[in-house]
Amino acid sequence: MSNRLHEELDIRCVKAPASIATATATKSDYVDGSGVDEIAFLWSMATLASGKTMTIKIYAADDATGTNATVVATGTVTAGADAIAKATGCASVKVPGDGKRYYCAEITHDSGSGVICSCVAIARPFYSPAVEPALVVSA
């Protein structure tokens, strides 16, 4: 029997909804990547005006405060001729296991005015097979 999707994923709000000014880089909280193979950051934006862009960068760092953070992935969403109501941008990164273990996502946009944005981080923990019970005998 399989779990329901929400039971298989670790989903965290890493940036509460807030107005983000145009051309202002805003980072989410850092999440610990140990025990997961991939982390996806899902940014939601109230509206992305026609021809405007949302850019998402993912940073890897040595600790949860962002020490020695470096950009490991970048993606852009651009609205076409029509504005995108309820715009969503998703970027993900594979966690190498031998590098930095803390990750965050940064968003910037060029909408011309403040836009309400929020972010969730989604990860699926590594599969760990059940451990066979051990028989302990003591004299």
Regions flagged by a language model, labelled:
Residues 1-139:
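Surface-exposed, low-hydrophobicity beta-strand/loop segments enriched in small/polar/acidic residues
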